[in-house]
Amino acid sequence: MRSYFFNEAKRCSFKSDYHGATAAKVGAVAVFKGTVIAKGYNKNKTHPLQYRYNCHRFDTNSNHYYPSKIHAEMEVVSKIRNLDIDFSKVTIYVYRETKEGTLAMARPCKACTAALKDLGIKTVCYTTENGYCEEKYK
């Protein structure tokens, strides 16, 4: 079943229009009770939720501007955050692929991790250079 959800996240990653420094394609899906309830991918579009959580990624005293391009995980969070469900039973699957088509580390950044934890999500599965990993949040 896990491979099915990673394949769904992979399909989402192909929609990515992000062309930043890494230009990696990232897709994510949220799964609740065996069903995909939301999909997302990284994009050039900004989002206020990403902007709010970016304080976890960057020095807030810095004068540098970091555009709040939405990450795949944050797009998923924005789609499910108002649902009336037990978020501790939601699993997020994140897939990342380089522009060359090889698997890459897709561990959520500090901003996305904070958003997932704030929502009460406890389990995140993501790609690594060598396969897949599951991480449990406290």
Summary of predicted features, one role per range:
Residues 1-138:
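Zinc-dependent deaminase catalytic domain
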